[in-house]
Amino acid sequence: MKKILLASLIAVSSQFALADNAPQVDPAFAKIETLVKAKNFNEAYKELDKLAQTGNAQAIYDLGFLTQAGQGTTKNDAKALELFKQSADKGYPTANYLLGKTYISGGLGVKPDQKTAINYLEKAAKQGIEEANVDLAALYLGENKDASTKKALKLLDPLVKKGNPQAVHLRA
């Protein structure tokens, strides 16, 4: 599990330049990525905290991730949840998606709350996270109402056309 969390943190923290005009990797995140790869979580946490103090939504999210995992700091689900909410409030798409999933399942000490889950997933979907549309569609289909089914299909059909495997599976 820790390897998955570590890989996810590195993936989230990295901004890969795939084109000549793509933005350069933020040097602060490059340093943090190096620290994480070296498993120096205490220093990575300190560097993220400095960056988070400037209001950087990704840094706040990553602090939540480390706090949830107990890497570089004491494991604390309540604090992690608060950090994820702060990041989402600043418009970080991944935080909105994670919170949506959290409120579906009831993780991080919260009780499952479909209304709150839908709120976060809708924000994540509007911010371009396709998986949020799939999760929303699954929630709507679970309501077993004609209007909800229509909403679900409206979300799924564009993804099916793009070949999204989760959408194809859910649509079947």
What is each of the regions a protein language model found here?
Residues 2-54, 58-62:
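N-terminal leader/linker segments that initiate helical-solenoid repeat arrays
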Residues 23-24, 40, 53-56, 69-71, ...:
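Short helix-capping/linker turns of helical repeat alpha-solenoids
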Residues 25, 170-172:
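Terminal, low-structured helical/coil segments at or just beyond the last alpha-helical repeat
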Residues 39-46, 74-83, 110-120, 144-155:
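Structural signature of tandem alpha-helical TPR/SEL1-like repeats
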Residues 126-128, 138, 142-147, 154, ...:
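Solenoidal tandem-repeat scaffolds enriched in leucines and small polar residues
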